[in-house]
A protein has these predicted regions:
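Surface-exposed, low-hydrophobicity beta-strand/loop segments enriched in small/polar/acidic residues
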Residues: 2-143
Length: 143
């Protein structure tokens, strides 16, 4: 039976000399950017800026967690930045109420940011519900 390694494990255990893991791979302090959105029939093509600050240079996003109090129905949400509106979450409905759902596009995860990022949600498909809340949490490391 073969012994296989993920990229970080290969660097740490299967090369000589070992390569130091990044904070996103081992030992990093996880930080969060969290915001709450109150639904009020926000319409398609609207954007909702989230977070009390920017993701800093060097941050490595690990995952995005969304929890909604009501289903978004036909409304879809994407999470991204200017120029890449679906960088962290492709447009999709959040259809299970009160159950945290984890998102993250693999190409954008554990990649150090070269510039600060302001995150926003983009609405498509239909308007958001008339009432309820959405909590968005972005977990990242920067050390």
């Amino acid at each position: 039976m073969a012994v296989l390694y993920g990229a970080a494990a290969a660097n740490a255990f299967n090369v000589s000399p070992p390569v130091k893991s990044s904070p996103g791979e081992h030992g990093g302090n996880i930080r969060s950017l969290t915001d709450t959105v109150t639904y009020a029939t926000q319409t398609t093509s609207d954007t909702i800026v989230i977070g009390g600050g920017l993701l800093p240079v060097g941050a490595r996003v690990l995952e995005v967690i969304m929890t909604t109090s009501v289903t978004t129905g036909s409304a879809t949400l994407a999470l991204g930045i200017t120029g890449t509106v679906a960088k962290y979450k492709a447009a999709g409905a959040v259809t299970t109420a009160n159950v945290p759902q984890v998102f993250g596009l693999a190409a954008a995860l554990n990649v150090p940011l070269t510039a600060p990022e302001q995150l926003f949600l983009t609405i498509a498909g239909a308007s958001l519900p008339a009432s309820g809340t959405l909590v968005v949490t972005v977990l990242y490391v920067v050390d």
